[in-house]
């Protein structure tokens, strides 16, 4: 091949490399995106405590964490007149290292779509369990062809409460100590009476361990079954939850607001809810208002979810939320006029109470937890046997001769 052909081939290769480099650089140019911020910072947030007692917790329920989603264009400017659809999912299921609410693992915690005139969507959500939450965000324009719709997936990792590690460490030490003492007693040299297969102390210890293990297994399973039975028996009484002080539908000052959706819920499954606002005279939707939604657990009065924003073009706000605590919840929606709206009125609200059916942890999760605790006791037992044998083992005669 001549020098001229080699130069042509080299030039073609360089041209292809330049084109590919330019294309890859263009494809990596940042486009529209969504930025997530939390208040307080996520490293200061802790999962919900099932029982916020001073003995086993902080003694109070923390307010929900504020999730702020801000949409930006390719130039880093806020996207105006956008509609943001948020889906919030909990961590994936892991029966080997479960959380306080295993039924909630791998489920959809929230699904809401709201208008964002400034490109920002804010919700307040109580996060029930530790782990990595997945936020699927879809941004579309309110005005047709204002910008290209896009989707983005964000991750939010919630650390575990440090108190849980402290209490777990204390429990492990107790179980290891019990096993260690048992192994120490079993490994001791004791005379076996005629007709006995083991010394009396060993037999008593083994019998006690068997009784404790059986009692623990029976307690874990019966308590769970009783909880399931109690919840199934209480299902007909779910309608007896005291009604809310405010009605679910109200006409006031020339406006009509109605809160509708599922009448009951079940832990681990999202409930569908909707609020609509209209003018009863013209039967037209009202959109120049601000809606504020608050979901409160009634037994301990902690806020599970809150949102504030305008309705859609049909005067409606629809959302799905999961109730991860098996207790009645109150949903309150208040409406107020926007600051620059021509229609001004006094704020009013509608509300309703929703009974929530609790679900006991799966049998698999309970058995795995019992197996972990049993394994810790067995490890302590083997360690006690080993230490006892080392103490009672006679010295090596060869070692004695070498010393003498």
Where are these regions (language model features)?
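Bacterial N-terminal signal peptides that target proteins for export
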Residues: 2-10
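Bacterial N-terminal signal peptides
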Residues: 12-21
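N-terminal soluble domains immediately following signal/targeting peptides that reside
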Residues: 24-403
């Amino acid at each position: 091949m001549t020098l001229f052909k080699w130069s042509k081939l080299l030039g073609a290769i360089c041209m292809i490399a330049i084109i590919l480099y330019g294309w890859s650089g263009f494809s990596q140019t940042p486009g529209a995106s969504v930025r997530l911020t939390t208040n307080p910072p996520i490293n200061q947030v802790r999962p919900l405590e099932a029982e916020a007692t001073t003995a086993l917790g902080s003694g109070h329920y923390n307010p929900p964490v504020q999730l702020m989603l801000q949409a930006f264009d390719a130039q880093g400017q806020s996207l105006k007149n956008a509609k943001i659809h948020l889906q919030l999912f909990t961590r994936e299921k892991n029966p080997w290292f479960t959380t306080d609410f295993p039924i909630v693992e791998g489920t959809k915690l929230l699904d809401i779509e709201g208008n964002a005139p400034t490109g920002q969507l804010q919700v307040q959500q109580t996060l029930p369990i530790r782990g990595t939450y997945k936020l699927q965000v879809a941004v579309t324009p309110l005005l047709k062809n204002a910008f290209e719709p896009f989707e983005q997936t964000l991750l939010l990792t919630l650390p575990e409460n440090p108190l849980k590690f402290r209490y777990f460490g204390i429990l492990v030490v107790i179980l290891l100590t019990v096993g260690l003492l048992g192994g120490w007693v079993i490994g001791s040299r004791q005379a076996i009476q005629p007709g006995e297969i083991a010394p009396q102390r060993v037999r008593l210890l083994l019998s006690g361990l068997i009784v404790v293990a059986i009692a623990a297994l029976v307690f874990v399973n019966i308590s769970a079954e009783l909880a399931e039975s109690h919840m199934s028996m209480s299902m007909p009484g779910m309608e007896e939850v005291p009604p809310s002080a405010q009605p679910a539908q109200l006409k006031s000052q020339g406006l009509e607001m109605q809160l509708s959706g599922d009448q009951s819920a079940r832990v681990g499954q999202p409930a569908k809810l909707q609020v609509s606002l209209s003018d009863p005279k013209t039967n037209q939707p009202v959109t120049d208002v601000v809606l504020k939604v608050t979901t409160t657990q009634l037994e301990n009065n902690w806020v599970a979810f809150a949102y504030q924003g305008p309705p859609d073009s049909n005067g409606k706000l629809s959302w799905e939320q999961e109730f991860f605590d098996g207790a009645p919840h109150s949903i309150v929606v208040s409406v107020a006029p926007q600051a620059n709206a021509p229609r001004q009125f006094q704020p009013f609200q509608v509300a309703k109470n929703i009974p929530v059916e609790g679900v006991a942890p799966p049998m698999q999760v309970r058995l795995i937890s019992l197996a972990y605790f049993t394994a810790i006791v067995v490890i302590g037992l083997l360690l006690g046997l080993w230490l006892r044998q080392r103490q009672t083992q006679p010295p090596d005669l060869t070692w004695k001769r070498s010393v003498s």
